[in-house]
Amino acid sequence: FQCEDGGWAAFDKNVTRSWLEKVPFADHNAILDPTCSDLTARVVELLDRVRARANLAMRARVVSRNDFPTAAGLASSASGFAALALAATRAAGLDLSLEELSDLARASSASAARSLFGGYAALPAGAHRAERVAPGDHFPLAMVVTLTTKGPKAIGSTQGMQHTAATSPYYAPWVDHAPKLYEEVRRAVLEGDIERLGVAMEHSALMMHASMLAASPAVIYLQPTTLAVMAKVRELRSQGTPAFYTMDAGPHVKVLTLDEHAARVAASVGEVPGVERTIISGPGPDAAITDQDPRSVA
């Protein structure tokens, strides 16, 4: 279970595609991508839960591909386990609702429980499944994903947060303050108030990173380019552009703005030295089955 209430928006340019092939026998320890070996156990556990639910013994070969960096603080595990939960259950002959899939995916990644829903969803602390807050067309938001480094991060999100919870004096205050921020975010989304949403989002992100910086030893995800992009966002806001930053457990910056300002924001943060590239995303749909084989996607 996650330790605090969480809000979430699904975006259309951060997509994971998963493909499953049933095979009579397979070595469940086989790893196609050694850089993701730490996820293998969770993948097997999810497949085992699906097999038990469908009363199957069949093994599966899994291919999962993101169109955004993996293990870099961009919610690749959330997207990945959401996609796998849907693909695995359909391959097993199960037709589960999004709510039931959310319950299944949550055991692998709390954030995956929210990623199944398009638009805006929430996962209250301790809940088994996420709930939809608003559809994607409720609020004309855009997220400018600003990539500040290449490659995976040195410390995984789960490892970093467990260490922070165990050693940081700022962890408990952050968690205690989360319900207030959660209500601010929820009301802001329902009322279409980007100012209120952005302020709460920035506050939450900074509290999280402050707690990690105070861990012993410190968990440091923010890089010089990260800080420079944050400064650029504040500059844009001082000039009247509604732009607000957030960072997950990683160095990349996600800039929240309105759709009409997204191109200008992307151009501005893209000029910051060290920025690799930017991706403009809008609200995305529910997780869905596709005929496109992820192995054919570049």
Give residue ranges: language-model regions.
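ATP-binding N-lobe of GHMP and related small-molecule kinases
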Residues: 1-72, 86-98, 267-268, 279-298
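Short beta-strand scaffold segments in enzyme catalytic cores
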Residues: 1-2, 17, 112-115, 119-122, ...
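Short alpha-helical "patches" and their helix-cap loops
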Residues: 13-14, 98-104, 158-166
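Short alpha-helix boundary/capping segments
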Residues: 35-38, 75-76, 170-173
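Short, well-ordered alpha-helical segments
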Residues: 41-44, 82, 227, 263
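Gly/Ser-rich oxyanion-binding loop with an adjacent helix/lid
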Residues: 56-140
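C-terminal nucleotide
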Residues: 135-298
